[in-house]
């Protein structure tokens, strides 16, 4: 594995991903019953945006820095932005960015549970040495293949919860691996909520991924949400990303109708920016 998320931490894709993740966790909190979260690709947990690697790309400047400045009063982003602010309360400017396991940990109550996986050996060691490693409700399985954890950890004792599948997509088989993981996960936990983040680089590959997921037998309702911040230009790096969300929380479905336009307007880099959402299975066309 060569991918290191520190180069991209806090970019537009992280804002898209983590804002919707935070909204989902807020809805899970609304019921008294405990919930379970499996994060298959946890990274290192905390990211220093002033470190050499992050500064080299400066992607956070067009991501979380811009979003925090221009959407500070957005009600649906309140919990997400508060987590970011609390991590930086002793800083003159935004320096540290929380990865998905850190964000999830902020929503855990006494009986809720988070299992985090990370395969990259160096990142796994870093993750274990963060405050997450001392969190009573958090179990870090690292180094471990997150796809194997889908088979090993499901179904959880808790009746409800979320699986976040957020791989680096550096392997040519990654989309196929995700489809296989979804198939295995749904066999074990049909009522679980499965959120798959993916990059949009090749429209044909993205369409094939949607088609392959849609071909799974007895697939529950599945929502696709996508954000493109500029016209596709390979020389400028990643231009778009999406969530394929099986059994999405109802509140997230409703929130996305408001948040996708906000994200697009705030993070757009040229006139080619756009967003859309649609049901792959079930419900109706949204935007």
Label the predicted regions.
Residues 1-287:
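Class I S-adenosyl-L-methionine-dependent methyltransferase catalytic core
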């Amino acid at each position: 594995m060569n991918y290191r998320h520190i180069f991209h931490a806090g970019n537009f894709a992280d804002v898209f991903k983590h804002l919707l993740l935070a909204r989902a966790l807020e809805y899970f909190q609304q019921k008294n019953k405990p919930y379970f979260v499996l994060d298959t690709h946890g990274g290192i947990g905390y990211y220093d945006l002033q470190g050499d690697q992050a500064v080299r790309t400066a992607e956070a400047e067009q991501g979380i820095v811009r979003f925090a400045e221009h959407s500070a009063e957005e009600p649906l982003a309140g919990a997400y932005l508060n987590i970011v602010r609390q991590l930086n309360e002793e800083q003159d400017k935004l320096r540290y960015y929380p990865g998905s396991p850190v964000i999830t940990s902020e929503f855990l109550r006494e009986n809720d549970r988070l299992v985090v996986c990370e395969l990259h050996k160096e990142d796994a060691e870093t993750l274990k040495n963060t405050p997450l490693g001392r969190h009573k409700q958090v179990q870090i399985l690292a180094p471990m293949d997150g796809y194997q954890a889908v088979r090993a950890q499901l179904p959880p004792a808790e009746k409800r919860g979320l699986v976040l599948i957020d791989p680096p997509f550096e392997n040519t088989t990654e989309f196929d691996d995700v489809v296989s993981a979804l198939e295995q996960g749904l066999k074990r936990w049909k009522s679980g909520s499965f959120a798959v983040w993916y990059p949009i680089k090749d429209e044909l590959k993205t369409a094939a991924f949607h088609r392959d997921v849609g071909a799974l037998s007895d697939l529950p309702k599945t929502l696709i949400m996508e954000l493109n911040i500029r016209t596709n230009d390979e020389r400028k790096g990643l231009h778009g990303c999406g969530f394929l969300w099986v059994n999405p929380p109802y509140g997230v479905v409703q929130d996305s109708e408001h948040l996708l336009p906000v994200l697009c307007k705030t993070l757009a880099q040229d006139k080619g920016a756009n967003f859309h959402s649609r049901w792959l299975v079930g419900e109706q066309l949204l935007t």
